[in-house]
């Protein structure tokens, strides 16, 4: 393992360092084991970055293993989306993707071994009866009447379960541990259940499937995982993890360690709530840009680097806390500020007519793609007698603090000329639709010759060459920091989380998407092209604003 001065540290890395110094492992091996029954979200990204990051930093390896032990809820669609997300984040798993179902024969053999040792039994108790017999945190459980069934009978009954002789829920295989244990997971947990369902990997071969707690530890051992990293809700289950490994004939003895899961403000991360958002049409789908899924973040314009950086910043601890959404937004803002080329777009347009500019004349102006990075080069932008500006950038009258265009006042058009507003044209409702101006032809790239000061600068697009576009302004999905704490979390949905505007974009953007996947539309925010775009009508998603507007709201 190569030490680096800048490598982050945390309690898990300290454990690994100690294990290596004590000679416990020749190489570090981790795994990321999602269940293929949904789409990954930002919380999974934390685990991905931790497991793959450790493997990378310690010159080890990380497996991608699908915990596919519940065929009724799993699908190959989720398998493919998870692979795509992990790859998109920039990580490579060791060898082929693995599946818990690869080990079904071995898992079944280990279950038989436990029966033979008198450490597992087939229970025909109804599920509600079994639940009642488990007891509570304050009261010990009661032994099942099937707990002392002899080994030979249990082997026969488990064979019948495996052969499909029993219906779902009719019986299950339980580990024989301790019904008086203070830890509920140790009170004879179910390790196999009957399930007559087609499996996306094994087809119809099996009608009994192992439970997660039985599968997890054995799969780790089979793969030679050295450090099995889980979130804190599995802390008590570590006792069951160790019990299984200690009571079967397997050489490898992996160890489980727990860290706090990600809790992020202004969103929800529980699968149940995310499913509800989709099924009740509060969002357009799993990749809705307001969703915390990796697919949603990607569609919104988040870069892999920004998500990895976010996971680095939040760190790894055992403390359960709420992370500010502004931290995630700061990561993408920093990334795009440095790497996104600039362009201009007008989202709420009014026309500006330059009356002393020759009709039919066009110019090609040169604009920098990034004010602080000359290596990004320049671009050509058209300029003619009519341009579009933002409606909010013009007022008929204003105080001195307003540094944009006002009647009888001057302003500079970004990368172009100084113009002066002379008169306006309005619609029947009194809204300004057109501003008539004059321009100073000697101010291209320089200040007025007579020394007058023009302080304001506004963006614009050339009316002759601009492309009509749709702009989707996404914001936080909820208007309270912790929507999960609400009695009905959907009541906290932000009604202004999506605003759609029809405007104009600088020519030439579609077909020339930058490497980072986004632009900074000057003075407006960072935008990416949405999948709904067409050549005739591009659609741009706002990834994030130029600054944190929610910070002001909270003050």
Swiss-Prot record:
GO BP term, example: glutaminyl-tRNA aminoacylation
Quaternary organization: Monomer.
EC nos: 6.1.1.18
Residue ranges annotated as motif 'HIGH' region: 34-44
Keywords of this entry: Aminoacyl-tRNA synthetase, ATP-binding, Cytoplasm, Ligase, Nucleotide-binding, Protein biosynthesis
Subcellular location: Cytoplasm
Protein name: Glutamine--tRNA ligase
Motif segment ('KMSKS' region): 268-272
Catalytic activity field: tRNA(Gln) + L-glutamine + ATP = L-glutaminyl-tRNA(Gln) + AMP + diphosphate
GO MF, one annotated term: ATP binding
UniProt record similarity statement: Belongs to the class-I aminoacyl-tRNA synthetase family.
Binding residue positions for L-glutamine: 67, 212
Xref: NCBIfam families: glnS, PRK14703.1
GO CC annotations on file: cytosol
Binding site for ATP: 35-37, 41-47, 231, 261-262, 269-271
CDD domains: GlnRS_core
């Amino acid at each position: 393992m190569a030490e680096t001065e800048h490598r982050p540290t945390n309690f898990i890395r300290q454990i690994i360092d100690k294990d290596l110094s004590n000679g416990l492992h020749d190489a570090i091996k981790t795994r990321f084991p999602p269940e293929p029954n949904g789409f990954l979200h930002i919380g999974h990204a934390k685990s991905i970055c931790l497991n793959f990051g450790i493997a990378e930093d310690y010159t080890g390896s990380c497996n991608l293993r699908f915990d596919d032990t519940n065929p009724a809820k799993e699908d190959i669609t989720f398998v493919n989306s998870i692979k795509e997300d992990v790859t998109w984040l920039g990580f490579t798993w060791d060898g082929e993707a693995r599946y818990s179902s690869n080990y079904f024969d071995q898992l079944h053999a280990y279950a038989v071994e436990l029966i033979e040792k008198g450490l597992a039994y087939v229970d025909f108790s109804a599920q509600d009866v079994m639940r009642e017999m488990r007891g509570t945190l304050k009261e010990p459980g009661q032994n099942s009447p099937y707990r002392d069934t002899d080994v030979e009978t249990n082997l026969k009954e488990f064979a019948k379960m495996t052969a499909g002789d029993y219906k779902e829920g009719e019986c299950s295989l339980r580990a024989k541990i301790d019904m008086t244990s203070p830890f509920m997971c140790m009170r004879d947990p179910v390790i196999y259940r009957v399930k007559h369902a087609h499996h996306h990997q094994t087809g119809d071969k099996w009608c009994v499937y192992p439970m997660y707690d039985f599968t997890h530890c054995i799969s780790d051992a089979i793969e030679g995982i050295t450090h099995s990293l889980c979130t804190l809700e599995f802390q008590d289950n570590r006792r069951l993890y160790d019990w299984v490994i200690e009571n079967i004939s397997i050489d490898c003895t992996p160890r489980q360690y727990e860290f706090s899961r990600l809790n992020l403000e202004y969103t929800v991360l529980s699968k149940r709530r995310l499913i509800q958002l989709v099924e009740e049409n509060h969002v357009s789908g799993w990749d809705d840009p307001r969703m915390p899924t990796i697919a949603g973040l990607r569609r919104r314009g988040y870069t892999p680097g920004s998500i990895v950086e976010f996971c680095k910043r939040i760190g790894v601890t055992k403390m359960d806390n709420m992370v500010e959404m502004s931290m995630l937004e700061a990561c993408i803002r920093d990334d795009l500020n440095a790497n996104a080329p600039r362009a201009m777009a007008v989202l709420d347009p009014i026309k500006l007519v330059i009356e002393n500019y020759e009709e039919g004349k066009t110019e090609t102006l040169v604009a920098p793609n990034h004010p602080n990075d000359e290596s990004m080069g320049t671009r050509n932008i058209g300029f003619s007698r009519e341009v579009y500006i933002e409606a909010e950038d013009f007022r008929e009258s204003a105080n001195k603090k307003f540094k944009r265009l006002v009647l009888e006042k001057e302003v500079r058009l970004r990368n172009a000329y100084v113009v002066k507003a002379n008169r306006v044209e309005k619609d029947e409702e009194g809204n300004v639709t057109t501003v008539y101006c004059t321009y100073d032809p000697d101010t291209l790239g320089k200040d007025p010759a007579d020394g007058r000061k023009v302080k304001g600068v506004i963006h614009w697009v050339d009316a002759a060459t601009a492309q009509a576009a749709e702009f989707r302004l996404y914001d936080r999905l909820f208007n309270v920091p912790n929507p999960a704490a609400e009695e009905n979390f959907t009541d906290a949905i932000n009604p202004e989380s999506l605003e759609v505007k029809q405007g104009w974009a600088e020519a030439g953007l579609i077909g020339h998407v930058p490497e980072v996947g986004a632009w900074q539309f000057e003075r407006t925010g960072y935008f990416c092209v949405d999948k709904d775009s067409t050549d005739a009508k591009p659609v741009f998603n706002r990834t994030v604003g130029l600054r944190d507007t929610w910070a002001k709201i909270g003050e």
